[in-house]
Amino acid sequence: VRVAGLQDQVRVGFQKPENKAGLTPKQQLEKIAQKTHALVKRQSSVYQELVYEQLKQQDVQVLMMDELSKTQKIFTQHFFEEHVFPVLTPVAVDAYRPFPTLLSKTMNIIVILEQQSEDEINEKVAIVQVPSVLTRMIKVPSKKGDTFVYLEDLIIDQINTLFYGYKVKTATAFRMTRNADLTIHEEGARDLLVEIERELKKRKWGAASRLEVRANE
């Protein structure tokens, strides 16, 4: 909420330094970004060096799609065809269809497509929402312990099946966090409860305050 409020101030051109820190909203955002990037880097290191290794010791592993055995690949393909493909709805983005409004903190995949015409290659963009009706961790058969793959990795692995006639140039998973700030005018609200309910519904569609992009392995 704090970051979203600062972003709102920058958006409207507010440049007055904040009394305690002596920094403008833009300068505060820059400081926050530096700190956040360092924290995310540390989080990744802790996962790789501690959590991931401890999971391996308990015979639990999360694999990339290219690390699966032939038998596991066959399983994931069948799982995709039976359970995932039926609930996927790709959305094209172009001059006539603007970028869709995505729910806060939902996992999505942005796909860059190429279509060959007689004289040129046309590039298009599509969005595929990772279905929330399915668990993100997909368990696959394993001779020892428990093995999982991420649902978004499985979708990306099979992404070509969604775009017949196109060549998939890139497919990248991302997640966006929206402004969850509540703006309630108590004095002008006839029914405070109704006003709160209205603002809570709007939180899902607030301005974007954070974008997380999955690194392509």
Give names to the regions the model predicted.
Residues V1-E217:
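N-terminal non-catalytic structural scaffold regions of very large proteins
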